[in-house]
Amino acid sequence: MPKPRVVHFLGGLSGIGEDLIYKLVCNNNRCSIVDTWYDLFVSKMSTELEIFSEKPFLFNPDLVNSNDLLLFFALDEKTVDLDGLAGIDCDVIILMNGDSPIEIQDARPNLIYIHDLISYSEVESLANKNLDELFDLCISNAEDFNFPSDKKHWWISQQDVAAGLVRLIDYTTPLPQLMHICGRRGWTIQETFEQLELLYSRTIAGSSGQFQTGHLESKPVIHPTVVKVSQITPSTRPDLSIINEVLVQIDGEGWRPLTPLRTSLMHYLATKDLD
């Protein structure tokens, strides 16, 4: 009888890594954590570990079995040391930032590029260059700025990515070598700023005691505008067909991110010092 599959966590685990570990612990999945993060995460989940039976253990390469899965989080890395993963005798998935593609010649490991991720962490301050620039504009109350009109971001929440990875974990059929993950809807910088500014102003008004009825007015997610056909640029969304097909094979649902942008931005704002 084969041993239960263990999910091994290596790399930079703050953000999506900690979210995924939490989900696995709550599902009583077995997992191990690299030593640099182990004590911090176990301490953070001490309450949950009193309830659920499967406590994460310290990663040991000698305890990796062929039916296990290793997840290497390299979202903040420009390069990945593949030689260090060569001796791992199990399925390996490297998660990388979609803005930092790498080339791999052999069939192992699998790559998942995550584009326009909105992440947050309870253990470390995370940077998001694009959102941080918009956040600075909110703080300065700037009015004289120009955004690129056609560039879109395909924002995806940390929760949706973690939920998708949970579905992949028990899938024993070999995965495609390369998959992309992002949101299904594109947002311009202007549209993103409008959403962030709305949430920021409501948050500041509430914390300062200056909340007014105007802050409760329903605001459209986007403002409808008429654009000439000649000004419409082709979609640059990453290819979601592969991840969608794999998830359809798993449970018939496909890739269906459910978290609204405003919810993701609220998680982002919750990590900021608004005093």
Feature locations, PLM:
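Amphipathic terminal alpha-helices
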Residues: P2-V7, I21-S32, S241-D275
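NAD(P)-dependent short-chain dehydrogenase/reductase
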Residues: E103-R167, L196
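Short acidic, S/G/P-rich loop/turn micro-motifs used as interaction or catalytic elements
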Residues: L13-L20, W37-L40, L75-D81, D99-P101, ...
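Conserved Rossmann-fold NAD(P)-dependent oxidoreductase catalytic core, especially the SDR/UDP-sugar
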Residues: L69-V123
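Flexible, charged surface loops at secondary-structure boundaries
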Residues: M1-P4, V25-C26, P61-D68, G84-C90, ...
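Mid/C-terminal beta-alpha module of Rossmann-like enzyme folds, strongest
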Residues: G164-S235, P257-D275
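Short, aromatic/basic amphipathic alpha-helical patches
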Residues: L20, V42-L49, L82-G87, E103-R108, ...
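N-terminal Rossmann/SDR dinucleotide-binding element
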Residues: M1-N65
